[in-house]
Each structure stands twice: as C-alpha cells, then as structure tokens.
C-alpha cells in the first residue's frame, strides 16, 4: 500500500467577492472562500495547522499561518468531509491564494494536504 493511498486529503475551494463588505475607493476588497476538505485516504487524520500565501495584483505577498481552521482542529475519518468558510481582505481587485494544511494521521504520521492556487477576483460585468 502506497502512502499516497493511505494519506490522501483533497481540498476544493469556492471563492466569492463580498461587495457589501468592500470599499474599493479605500482599496479594500473583501473575499470569502468556502473550503471542502475530504479524506480520501485509508486512515483518519486531524488538521492541526494552516499555511496560506496570499498575493495581490501588485505582487505583494502575505503569509498567514495558524493552528487549525476557524478555531477547530477537525478529525476526518476516511470518506469524511469538513466544510468551512473564511475570508480575506485584499488591497487590489484581484489576487491569488494557495497553501497547505498540516495533518496528523491517527497512526502518528505527519503529512501536508496541499491547497492549489485559486483566484480571488471581482466578477466583471459586460456592457
């Protein structure tokens, strides 16, 4: 059995612009993102930390690290999902986020669950 089969976490992200919480004239653009974390592996694992790299349209990079997500360190059994929504404020109308979660399996193995880059952007209207 390969480690990839034993320790497999998938992450899906759905970002959205929060117009009512943004103030473009002040350089504040609010975005929410809903995350689905799915344990595709064969052993339960706990999400213990998060690591984000946030880049705005000017190339300014911010690193955000912390314990768990939204105040929790969820344990996912094989086949289980965990969903949460959080947010970020950018100084530009678009940017990207990417990162990973630190996971600890029930057998003590530590591994990373990558979060592929995703785009934060204001929806454009066509005229």
UniProtKB/Swiss-Prot annotation:
Gene3D superfamilies: ApaG domain. It comes from the Bacteria. InterPro entries: ApaG_domain, ApaG_sf, Uncharacterised_ApaG. Residues 3-127 form the ApaG domain. Pfam families: DUF525. GO terms for biological process: error-free translesion synthesis. This is Protein ApaG. The gene is apaG.
């Amino acid at each position: 059995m390969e480690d990839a089969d034993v320790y497999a976490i998938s992450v899906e992200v759905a970002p959205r612009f929060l117009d009512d919480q943004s103030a473009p004239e002040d350089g504040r653009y609010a975005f929410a993102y809903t995350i689905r974390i799915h344990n595709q592996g064969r052993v339960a694992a706990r999400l213990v930390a998060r690591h984000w790299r946030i880049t705005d349209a000017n190339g300014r990079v911010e690193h955000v690290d912390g314990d768990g997500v939204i105040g929790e360190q969820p344990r996912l059994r094989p086949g289980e999902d965990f969903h949460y929504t959080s947010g970020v404020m950018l100084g530009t109308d678009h940017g990207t986020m990417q990162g990973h979660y630190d996971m600890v399996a029930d057998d003590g193995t530590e591994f990373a669950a990558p979060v592929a880059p995703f785009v934060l952007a204001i929806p454009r209207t066509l005229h």
